[in-house]
Amino acid sequence: MRWQGSSRRKVTGGKVINARGKRKFEMGRESAETRISEIKRKNVHTMGGNRKVRLLQCDVANITNPKDGKTTSAPIETVLDNIANKHYIRRNILTKGSVIRTPLGTAKVTSRPGQDGVVNAVLIE
């Protein structure tokens, strides 16, 4: 689990003396790290009784051509670039902003696969 509360250190490097401890609502979850493979989803219960769909694996993307505005589904071949983490390129992990190669051309992922449960992308070439 990840803790998403405020830091225990000040900007100067000194310790902050907290008036209280950690709270459960400050906890986060590990990232989904969506890989290129046969589609695999996971439902997660979130705060307020809501649900979030985590996309663990995916091999298809909804690709929009900005010139004509049409969206088509195409298989994902590989990850070419990922600004989130340079090591994600070798591991073929999809995140928002990653550049993927498809039969239609290179595209940039615009959705958040670990949060939305789908891979949407826009052609860049």
Curated annotation (Swiss-Prot):
GO biological process: translation
Protein name per the record: Small ribosomal subunit protein eS8
Similarity comment: family membership: Belongs to the eukaryotic ribosomal protein eS8 family.
Pfam family, one: Ribosomal_S8e
NCBIfam families: eS8 (TIGR00307)
Molecular-function annotations in GO: structural constituent of ribosome
HAMAP family: Ribosomal_eS8
Keyword Ribonucleoprotein: yes
Top-level lineage group: Archaea
